[in-house]
Design a protein with these regions (language model features):
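Extended, intrinsically disordered, low-complexity segments
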Residues: 28-56, 269, 279-280
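N-terminal carbohydrate-binding/catalytic regions of secreted carbohydrate-active enzymes
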Residues: 97-100
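Alpha/beta enzyme core
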Residues: 55-94, 104-242, 250-275, 280
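Protein-protein interaction and targeting regions used for scaffolding, dimerization, and localization
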Residues: 1-39
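Short hydrophobic "strand-cap" motifs at the C-terminus of beta-strands
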Residues: 245
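Generic surface-pattern signal
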Residues: 12-16, 20, 47, 58, ...
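Exposed alpha-helical structural elements
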Residues: 2, 6, 10, 41, ...
Length: 280
């Protein structure tokens, strides 16, 4: 089945979900929430040779494990060296998954975080995604050489909305290749997309070898939405991580995003989230 056919099939399935109540179907394993899905997935991995099955912390235990979901983020253009240094100290203290910073700070963060277990994440083609593939490839190679372990690239939104799926898939695949061994998260910027385009973009990320699909840059008119996270999770299944970013500022929102299928959260209010505090 070619890419266009797979896209059409998944769109039909997902749009059908909006007109029918959720029930167990042959494709229900994409939801990752109902008991049938979880049971079938565990049986599947055991039957294929797994001798142990691990699970992320349940929602009830998030107060202990939530920090491991969070990319502690400072992407504002006015961020100073002192603020970046504070970001790294906080990430090491709270054991966040990573710091997410602009490329100019990657080497500095890699030096500060050496030996802490906190990864350095950065952005490519940010925040518009409209630079050439060649420019993104150059950026990706450079930041990985400087110590980035994760690269959050922005999809070419205009090409996606123009239906140029081969171009978009190639763009993603080239950054995945250039970033190796770092993992790539593809920001599809949901605020500009229809549901059909979100499905197409998520599938293209999977086909192109990305490691995560991500909701938002945080610089668009809106950020992560629970329904988008759930949709992206259903489309990519267990194959990719899902990162929710933009507007996540309190524990309750973070909890709902994870419950919907997010395996990573991008946030600048990370400490307030893990300490259950309100941010003005």
């Amino acid at each position: 089945m070619n890419l266009d056919s797979r896209i059409d099939r998944i769109i039909a399935e997902e749009l059908g979900r909006h007109t029918h109540a959720h029930k167990h179907t042959p494709h229900c394993n994409w939801c990752w929430t109902c008991p049938e899905c979880k049971s079938e997935f565990v049986s599947h991995v055991v039957n294929h040779g797994a001798c142990r099955v691990g699970a992320a912390p349940g929602i009830g235990q998030l107060h202990d494990g939530l920090a491991q979901y969070i990319d502690h983020t400072l992407l504002k253009p006015e961020g100073t060296r002192a603020q970046i240094e504070t970001l790294c100290k906080e990430a090491a203290e709270y054991h966040f998954a990573s710091v997410c910073v602009n490329p100019t700070w990657v080497a500095f963060c890699a030096h500060l975080l050496r030996g802490t277990g906190v990864l350095v994440c950065t952005v490519v083609g940010f925040p518009l995604g409209a630079t050439t593939t060649e420019a993104k490839v150059f950026e990706a190679r450079q930041v990985v050489e400087q110590g980035a372990c994760e690269v959050d690239m922005v999809v070419n939104i205009g090409r996606l909305k123009s239906g140029e799926y081969d171009f978009v898939a190639h763009d993603i695949a080239e950054i995945v290749k250039a970033s190796h061994p770092a993992h790539v998260k593809v920001i599809i910027e949901n605020c500009y997309l229809t549901d059909e385009e979100k499905i197409k973009a998520s599938l293209l990320c999977r086909e192109a070898g990305a490691h995560f699909v991500k909701t938002s840059t945080g610089f668009g008119p809106s950020g992560a939405k629970i329904e988008d996270v759930a949709l992206m999770r259903r489309v990519v299944g267990e194959h990719l991580g899902v990162k929710a970013a933009g507007g996540i500022r309190e524990f309750q929102t973070a909890e709902k995003m994870i419950e919907a299928g997010a395996t990573r959260l991008g946030a600048s209010a990370s400490i307030a989230i893990v300490e259950h505090k309100k941010v003005a």
